[in-house]
């Protein structure tokens, strides 16, 4: 499978420091959005991406890619938690992480937080991940509607993030790329951080990685 990839990140208009990190290193692609403010968020996202790259960035057997990716995310979680525990300036830091490893015919996903992975197919953009936020949980439980979720004051509160819990729960998925190739001239998988509280689309404020086959 031939891959084309690109990445960009912008601090935006509201923050002074860019707390996002990414990796575009075939077969590994990932985005991370740091939490904790000041130095912490930037350190957490960079550490998570660096650990992920070290543990899952090399080519390996197809049948072991999902296991390697899962283990790498858990290793990244431990690395962020350990750094925060050993440096009082970084107390409370954490990060989201949405990553994929490309195999021969499949793409393996791992996800924690509210960064997002999308599948772009025949012009349709489909969300592949679920936001781990308090507001999304409230939405699923019927406590609020989608319009209320977009402006809810707690829409930035995460229910899962790397570095916060020693045994983080990782969402996983598989995209069968061979099926996409049969139907598409230019199939793409996109990973991005969409502004929190904007559940509908990958817009201009998103940091994104797109992978085409």
Predicted regions and their residues:
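Short, intrinsically disordered C-terminal tails of secreted or membrane-associated proteins
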Residues: 205-212
